[in-house]
Amino acid sequence: MNYLKDNFVCGTKDITDEPYCGMSGRHEVWGNAVNTTNGAGPHNIQIFVLNPDGTVLHCLPGYWNSEDLITELDFAKRVNQLYMTTGSIEAKKQQFVQMHMAHIKQHSPAMVQRSHMQGFDQMYEAKKRLETTDTIANMAAVKNALATKGHIPDSAFKTTDVIMHERDAKQPFVPYDQFNVVAFSDYGKTKYDKNEDYHNVYGRVDMQAARNAPEIGINKDAQKTTANSNQPLSYKDYLRRHGIR
């Protein structure tokens, strides 16, 4: 918090009605917080770092570990230094791309480990968007696993830190109101929720309480299940509703 206070002016925007918004439970600012993987829930949260004139220096999709967030914010400060230099905007845009792509190799092994895509998001990309996704690192491995109904290795997918910088590099020094958030945040399922406020003393989700929890956003992947009826949810129905395999 001190890092943010000392280096940035922070604000939030409600994206509930935006076309790129995903879906999750409603979590108040005083609610519980839990750990998850970098880049989880990209449709629900986007962390923008802007120059005071509104130009996008960096954008991070979804949740980020605090240590890794500071790494990326430090990087954004260097991108801002580039933006503030004299010279043609075209030359600076080329450097923007180079900086974002080069920073991928500067990520620590621990950060990369924290940036593996959620398993249900990997399956969504492989089964629903195989021919269009940019999230797969080894297409042959994915296609072979799908054809043989085998396990898709985690290494067949790009980590979210790579996806982030590659997508940022496609929009160099774009004004905030022109940034294509739809394209940037579009990977995995649109619903992501860890039910932070419904964890019991054992660290497990209270399924009965979570079932009736208020939700916000639009679940574009939703299918009709017993969750749409008045029948009690089974354990499998609950997991399916929350995108958990």
List PLM regions with ranges.
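A short acidic/small-residue loop/turn micro-motif
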Residues: Y63-N65
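Thioredoxin-like thiol-disulfide oxidoreductase module
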Residues: M1-H58, D74-A76, H151, S155-F173, ...
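Non-globular targeting/processing and membrane-anchoring segments
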Residues: D68-R245
